[in-house]
A protein has these predicted regions:
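Hydrophobic scaffolds flanking metal-cofactor catalytic centers in soluble metalloenzymes
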Residues: 15-21, 27-41, 52-55, 248-260, ...
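Conserved beta-strand elements of the Class I
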Residues: 125-126, 241, 313
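Cofactor-cradling patches in redox/metallo enzymes
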Residues: 131-218, 249-266, 270-350
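Iron-sulfur-cluster electron-transfer modules
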Residues: 10-13, 30-196, 201-211
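Cysteine-cluster motifs in flexible loop/terminal segments that predominantly coordinate metals
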Residues: 16-22, 60-63, 283-288
Length: 350
């Protein structure tokens, strides 16, 4: 463990009062301890750790949100991941399945599989994110066409934000990848970025100075949804449960915008017990689906089971897929806005 990491452990250990509030929403703590105070004390005394420990954390930030004294295990475990990368000289243990992330990221920044900013006739671009592009290219195209109507001249940038690399602890490689984005933003004179992904919203917002980063949901809420979709959900005779993605748990404008969109659609929906700033991860956070698949699978099942309605509606592609793996019928809000999935749902419920 690096000296810096040890100092972080000491800070968190001193702050922790052992109330276990964080354990209500964290599966990895249940695997490694009965009380986070004990775990932090052990790390402090040993000055070392099992490399799987930090890669079992979903890095969702729930702990810091609910902790009465401000303990932030996400920041600590991300730093410990960086220690593992440094100590292994970038060659992470095979059990972490990091090669899958490396391949994904190399393709996501390859000129063969991605493009530079296209169709830019203003200072605004749409940054849909790699998950949405890979899973729903039709929806990305339709969403972009909508944006071109309400914000003429909007360009589009088909790249990844690099967060998978950052969350694996490879900060140097992340800076290299993110530098590609910054160079393109600078050369094309981009000033405003509309993101379709919660991870992209946070990553670009936290790492780009002087750029305005806006969520697609805020744009949709203020500009209005496509006219032909207004009130269309009123014809459905079943309900939805809304799942808030964890990356933007602290961004209230996104929470409000999404709920405004659902109301414009005319959808009947309910809230999960853990919602908004206290939402739970879907199980895909922190690349744990690769590094500790059992923890991810168990937590996904738990989160999906917390929805009482026929369908789960969310606004993150990874969350959508996770809820389906958890055994629920799940839709991305863009499925309803820019693809005719209302008809599919009606057929399913006949």
């Amino acid at each position: 463990m690096s000296d810096y990491s040890l100092s972080l452990v000491r800070e968190e250990q001193e702050k922790c009062i052992g109330c276990k509030a964080c354990m209500k929403g964290c599966p990895m703590l249940h695997k490694y301890c009965h009380n986070p105070k004990d775990l932090l004390t052990e790390l402090l005394n040993e000055g070392a750790f099992d490399y799987k420990l930090p890669y079992s954390c979903m890095l969702c930030g729930y702990c810091a949100e609910v902790c009465p004294t401000g303990v932030d295990l996400k920041a600590l475990f991300l730093q410990l991941r960086k220690d593992v990368v440094n100590e292994s000289k970038g060659k992470l243990p095979k059990e972490l399945n990091s090669k899958a992330v490396d391949f994904h990221q190399s393709f996501s920044f390859s000129r063969i599989f991605t493009s530079d900013i296209q169709n830019l006739q203003s200072r605004t671009i749409f940054f849909p994110g790699c998950a949405l592009m890979a899973n729903s290219p039709e929806i990305v195209e339709n969403t972009y066409n909508y944006l071109r109507e309400v914000i003429p001249g909007t360009g589009i940038y088909a790249k990844c934000c690099g967060k998978p690399t950052l969350f694996m602890g490879k900060e140097g490689k992340f800076r290299e990848y993110f530098g590609i984005l910054e160079k393109e933003f600078r050369e094309k004179g981009v000033e405003r970025i509309i993101t379709g992904c919660q991870n992209c919203f946070m990553t670009i917002g936290q790492n780009s100075k002087g750029l305005e980063v806006v969520s697609l949901w805020e744009v949709l809420a203020t500009k209005g949804i496509p006219k032909e979709k207004a009130g269309i959900g009123k014809d459905l005779d079943f309900d939805f449960t809304l799942h808030d993605p964890c990356p933007t748990r602290s961004v209230n404008i996104i929470h409000e915008s999404v709920r405004s969109i659902l109301e414009q659609l005319g959808l009947s929906y309910g809230e999960m017990k853990f919602n908004r700033n206290r939402t739970l991860c879907c199980g895909s956070g922190g690349m744990v689906g690769l590094t500790e698949p059992k923890i991810a699978k168990d937590h996904t099942s738990r989160r999906a089971s917390e929805a009482s309605a026929d369908y789960i509606i969310t606004y993150c592609q990874e969350c959508t897929e996770s809820m389906r793996r958890g055994g629920k019928k799940s839709y991305h809000i863009l499925d309803l806005l820019f693809r005719d999935d209302f008809q599919n749902m009606k057929q399913e419920n006949k």
